[in-house]
From Swiss-Prot:
Chain coiled-coil ranges: none
A GO CC term assigned to this protein in UniProt: fungal-type vacuole membrane
Gene3D superfamilies per UniProt: Leucine-rich Repeat Variant, V-type ATPase, subunit H, C-terminal domain
An example Gene Ontology biological process: proton transmembrane transport
Tagged with keyword Ion transport: yes
Keywords: Hydrogen ion transport, Ion transport, Membrane, Transport, Vacuole
Record protein name field: V-type proton ATPase subunit H
One Pfam family in the UniProt entry: V-ATPase_H_C
Function: Subunit of the V1 complex of vacuolar(H+)-ATPase (V-ATPase), a multisubunit enzyme composed of a peripheral complex (V1) that hydrolyzes ATP and a membrane integral complex (V0) that translocates protons. V-ATPase is responsible for acidifying and maintaining the pH of intracellular compartments. This subunit is essential for activity, but not assembly, of the enzyme complex. This subunit is also required for silencing the ATPase activity of V-ATPase when V1 is detached from V0.
Entry similarity comment: Belongs to the V-ATPase H subunit family.
InterPro entries membership: ARM-like, ARM-type_fold, ATPase_V1-cplx_hsu, ATPase_V1-cplx_hsu_C, ATPase_V1-cplx_hsu_C_sf
Amino acid sequence: MSNSDLELSNAASPPPVELDNSQVDEIINNVRCVAIPWQGYQRSGSLEENELQEIENLTGKPLSAYVKTAEEDTTAYSNLFLKLLSMKDTPDVVNFALVKLADTLLNSNKFLSAFGPAFYDFLEKDESYINYLDDDSKLLFARVFALCSSSSPCSVAKAFTLFLEYLGKLMQSLNPLTRLFAVQCLNGVLTLKAHRYALWAENTCSFRLAELLRNSIGDTQLQYYSLFCFWQLTFESHIAQDINKRFDLIKLLVQIIRSDTKTKVYRLVLAILVNLIDKAPKDTISTMLLEHVDKAVQLLQKRKWADEDITNYLDFITSTLDESSKHLSTFDMYKSELDTGILHWSPSHRSEDFWHQNAKRLNEDNYALLKKLFHIVQYNEDNTSLAVACHDLGAYIRSYPEGRSLIIKYGAKQRIMDLMSHPDPEVRFEALSTVQLLMTEVCFLSKITL
């Protein structure tokens, strides 16, 4: 099975631009109830007579009627909406425009295609537009921005970055509906390749998305939309190669598989795994074996699934991992674990035979793997990773005594000594054990000198 056969509908998704959210719906309903003195704006010169007529064509009529009206003259009504959006000092007018505009965009692909480029031209002249709006207006603006960006790539880099930063802030909200809305908006814009790479380069928003997914157990909708964002990201090979290193995503997917969740969530998790195998096999398959994805998937295979796609995903993942396990050596697995930057107590770490056979291999390619251990010890904040890295450096010099000088040369000795006072007892123990091995050599050399 090739992942190129997968379509958007195959992940059991609603149209990503629907953005159904009761919090935002309440704001929209309130906006619809506001009476705006349009004739007063026309008399004051804020609106032209023809613009007043166009506004009247949008008010007091069924949705289908005013959408049809806007479709008949996309240029005129695009200009009208942008004119109303430019009236930032009149929030009621801006909100009216944002609500009517979203209605039209949601129900007319023709208008969506025509309005997007004009909207970006508008933002080109006012890149920080979102910053001038009040909280409710920002939510409505984000809705319109997501709709436009689901259809055509945003050509205003700063405006898109500000949009992502805004979504990142919403993801930190204490209100679960606000967090959900942020992920729904992000889900909409990620339908386009350019926006996937823009999100990946921006960093902050994607990290908050990952944090939301980690904490989404029990919130099926948030979990689902968060996973859908990751699924779209993994269609890009460059992103798929790095996504597990950045977020430890495979481990998280295994946790979700082992939880009791909805079929649509399992479906997305499996689709992400298929993408990772298809787009970045060298970077992900060995990690999947380390995280026991094969065993987790086997648990799902014991269930009866009415969904044929799920059974196909399960069969593909199982057969691929089974075949790969026959060809990957223990050292290949260890190397892949180091590549992730996140270490676990897998069997190779405590195996004396493994270190006797492979310690010198850490020196290959200008000490590439050894330097990765140094980097983990120096910068990683995960307690288990720190403990395992300290242990591995001790095992390395136990099997390759000459390695002591390398640990000192690259500055890792002082860091390991510092870790002897780490708050985690396992980290302290492994750091102490490795320091003892380092100091044993120092004492031995001192005696020789004397």
